[in-house]
Amino acid sequence: MPNPSSTSSPYPLPEEIRNLLADVETFVADILKGENLSKKAKEKRESLIKKIKDVKSIYLQEFQDKGDAEDGEEYDDPFAGPPDTISLASERYDKDDEAPSDGAQFPPIAAQDLPFVLKAGYLEKRRKDHSFLGFEWQKRWCALSKTVFYYYGSDKDKQQKGEFAIDGYSVRMNNTLRKDGKKDCCFEISAPDKRIYQFTAASPKDAEEWVQQLKFVLQDMESDIIPEDYDERGELYDDVDHPLPISNPLTSSQPIDDEIYEELPEEEEDSAPVKVEEQRKMSQDSVHHTSGDKSTDYANFYQGLWDCTGAFSDELSFKRGDVIYILSKEYNRYGWWVGEMKGAIGLVPKAYIMEMYDI
């Protein structure tokens, strides 16, 4: 056992040991830092931190170029192995998670004030570490607001730690980022000549949901299909160049609405309210044929404003923030639309939902 008082390493520190110390210090110094620990656990944490510092003092030669773990200065690891995909990509990581975003492109905004949040939750974000670890994973509250990805220390933060516009990026699952039990929970957002952002979700399912939501927005941004124009109330404007595929009545007291319905193919539109149940079934049978363009039908995605429990079997029940895809607005005059959520189709009160995207 080397003498702790020595100022240089008696022999090179094996890479496996350095990697182990990296994991231990990340867990003890960072992950446990914000946890509510018992007195005994806090004492043990401080003891482990001290032991790690002792090891660094013993192997001073190997760590002298890495600087103090708390000074925030960057370094290059002279003992790093041959470059691989991950190490090369790391040069494009967010080098300082606490620094302002690139070019101060977006103004500071509190996490609770973000508009049109499509997906939010806690993730572990990979970044360049400032100690001898090389890399670290830090817990961040992340949110996709419209087409901008924000990350915060917590969902109560008044200002983001960073953000980036996802335009031009691609997203994919990546199980090579970790070797522990969370390897199947990882995904990355990347683009040529831009920083790579890599995250770990709480579960593989959560990671897949992040990937699918990001892909949906990215595909919509790249699509040449222009969604139908809606006013602020979510009602459809008349298109003078093309006939409407289904009946979408305007909320208006003008009697000309009935004439519009009669000109459309669906004759059932003018049926009396007593036949609504039959129309509902026909509508729900037909909407399956119109949902194929869902990935690009940006304007028909809504989210719940309040919790709503359906009174009948043909009505959807949903919570505040739930994503609902609107399949039909043919019952607009009654205040109901036909929507789909998690594979279930039913009637949705339009007063209980709002547009997900600001078009």
UniProtKB/Swiss-Prot annotation:
GO BP terms in the entry: B cell activation; negative regulation of cell population proliferation; signal transduction
A Pfam family it matches: PH
Region (Homodimerization): 14-64
Keywords (A to Z) from UniProt: B-cell activation, Cytoplasm, Phosphoprotein, SH3 domain
Post-translational note: Phosphorylated in resting platelets. Phosphorylated by FYN on Tyr-261 upon T-cell activation. Dephosphorylated on Tyr-75 by PTPN22.
Domain SH3: 297-358
InterPro entries reported for this sequence: PH-like_dom_sf, PH_domain, SH3-like_dom_sf, SH3_domain, SKAP_fam
Gene3D superfamilies per UniProt: 6.10.250.220, Pleckstrin-homology domain (PH domain)/Phosphotyrosine-binding domain (PTB) (2.30.29.30), SH3 Domains (2.30.30.40)
Ranges of residues in domain PH: 116-219
UniProt entry tagged with the keyword Phosphoprotein: yes
SUPFAM superfamilies, A to Z: PH domain-like, SH3-domain
Stretches with biased composition (Basic and acidic residues): 275-293
An annotated GO cellular component: cytoplasm
Residues carrying Phosphotyrosine: Y75, Y151, Y197, Y261
Tissue specificity field: Ubiquitously expressed. Present in platelets (at protein level).
Modified positions (Phosphoserine) in chain numbering: S5, S6, S9, S87, S90, S223, S283, S286
Spans annotated as Disordered: 66-88, 264-293
Free-text function comment from the UniProt entry: May be involved in B-cell and macrophage adhesion processes. In B-cells, may act by coupling the B-cell receptor (BCR) to integrin activation. May play a role in src signaling pathway.
Family of the protein in this entry: Belongs to the SKAP family.
Assembly: Homodimer. Interacts with PTPNS1. Part of a complex consisting of SKAP2, FYB1 and PTPNS1. Part of a complex consisting of SKAP2, FYB1 and LILRB3. May interact with actin. Interacts with FYB1, which is required for SKAP2 protein stability. Interacts with LAT, GRB2, PTK2B and PRAM1. May interact with FYN, HCK and LYN. Interacts with FASLG.
PANTHER family: SRC KINASE-ASSOCIATED PHOSPHOPROTEIN 2, SRC-ASSOCIATED ADAPTOR PROTEIN
Domain topic, free-text comment: The SH3 domain interacts with FYB1 and PTK2B.
Protein name (Swiss-Prot/TrEMBL): Src kinase-associated phosphoprotein 2
Taxonomic lineage from the root: Eukaryota, Metazoa, Chordata, Craniata, Vertebrata
